[in-house]
Curated annotation (Swiss-Prot):
It comes from Homarus americanus (American lobster). GO terms for molecular function: glyceraldehyde-3-phosphate dehydrogenase (NAD+) (phosphorylating) activity; NAD binding; NADP binding. The active site is at residue 148. This is Glyceraldehyde-3-phosphate dehydrogenase. Pathway: Carbohydrate degradation; glycolysis; pyruvate from D-glyceraldehyde 3-phosphate: step 1/5. Its main location: cytoplasm. NCBIfam families: GAPDH-I. It catalyses: D-glyceraldehyde 3-phosphate + phosphate + NAD(+) = (2R)-3-phospho-glyceroyl phosphate + NADH + H(+). The modification N-acetylserine is found at residue 1. Homotetramer.
Length: 333
């Protein structure tokens, strides 16, 4: 089935790159703020992930990538986007604005059949690849791919809980800057700290990522919460999860469980490394979460801290496509 992308920002553009790399068919892009000519430029040149390796051009009022024609719309309101004109049925809602079932459902007016919100949602069912995809059913029309941080945390929490039982835990994500932040101090009425210069500061921030794990792994509901520090790096973030466990274990036991999961049921979603890595080593890594065996610590047999990396842009965008593929498989069955 054909895919449409609403919002051609960091995630929208990388979802298109991800789609092209695995043969998923994107037929339309909507963005009211980006003219076609500028779309070509923005898609081709990326300061973080490099110049796009294929061919990008505009032709007959369309965006053409590697010979594939993508229809471009510039509508402000989702209900005005004529998705059916381009044959787009599965929509990636990556504006960051229409994150509830009601708001995202506006896409159906233009002929869309399903919507994946590329952000957490207050009411849409949330999915994390490798964790709860089996809960998806045909009758769901608007779903959420959760957040990049939830996608990093959930696989790690799943492995810990299934093997050693999480009693309770606190998460900190040391998170790269995103587009909502300011280059220098500026107005940010809802989040005063968030309005401070992104390149000059370590900025404490809130995140719903840990609580959201309770939505995708119901047994952990109410057992995890967390916060974030925004730091002056352009991409790649890291989750630090401190947990009290119900079963006694050694840190080596935890490493073994993570390694086994990364090579088995969670392959492609959870990675494992014993190397002396730093954040930039993960730019362009398409896994959701890469467990850092050397960085974790243990205080007692039931009290540990685990560390896991993620490319918050690229890995997450790959998951959006993975979720779409799963939905299409279930929907066509």
């Amino acid at each position: 089935s054909k895919i449409g992308i609403n919002g051609f920002g960091r995630i929208g553009r990388l979802v298109l790159r991800a789609a092209l790399s695995c043969g998923a068919q994107v037929v339309a892009v909507n963005d009211p703020f980006i003219a076609l000519e500028y779309m070509v430029y923005m898609f081709k040149y990326d300061s973080t992930h490099g110049v796009f390796k294929g061919e990008v051009k505009m032709e007959d009022g369309a965006l053409v990538v590697d010979g594939k024609k993508i229809t471009v719309f510039n509508e402000m309101k989702p209900e005005n986007i004529p998705w059916s004109k381009a044959g787009a049925e599965y929509i990636v809602e990556s504006t960051g604005v229409f994150t509830t079932i009601e708001k995202a459902s506006a896409h159906f007016k233009g002929g869309a059949k399903k919507v994946v919100i590329s952000a957490p949602s207050a009411d849409a069912p949330m999915f994390v690849c490798g964790v709860n995809l089996e809960k998806y059913s045909k009758d769901m029309t608007v779903v959420s791919n959760a957040s990049c941080t939830t996608n990093c945390l959930a696989p790690v929490a799943k492995v810990l809980h299934e093997n050693f039982e999480i009693v309770e835990g606190l998460m900190t994500t040391v998170h790269a800057v995103t587009a909502t932040q300011k280059t220098v101090d500026g107005p940010s009425a809802k989040d005063w700290r968030g309005g401070r210069g992104a390149a000059q500061n370590i900025i404490p921030s809130s995140t719903g990522a840990a609580k959201a794990v309770g939505k995708v792994i119901p047994e952990l509901d109410g057992k995890l919460t967390g916060m974030a520090f925004r730091v002056p790096t352009p991409d790649v973030s890291v989750v630090d999860l401190t947990v009290r466990l119900g079963k006694e274990c050694s840190y080596d036991d935890i490493k073994a469980a993570m390694k086994t999961a990364s090579e088995g049921p969670l392959q492609g979603f959870l990675g494992y490394t014993e190397d002396d890595v730093v954040s930039s080593d993960f730019i362009g890594d398409n896994r959701s979460s890469i467990f850092d065996a050397k960085a974790g610590i243990q205080l007692s047999k039931t009290f540990v801290k685990v560390v896991s990396w993620y490319d918050n842009e690229f890995g997450y965008s790959q998951r959006v496509i993975d979720l779409l593929k799963h939905m299409q498989k279930v929907d066509s069955a």
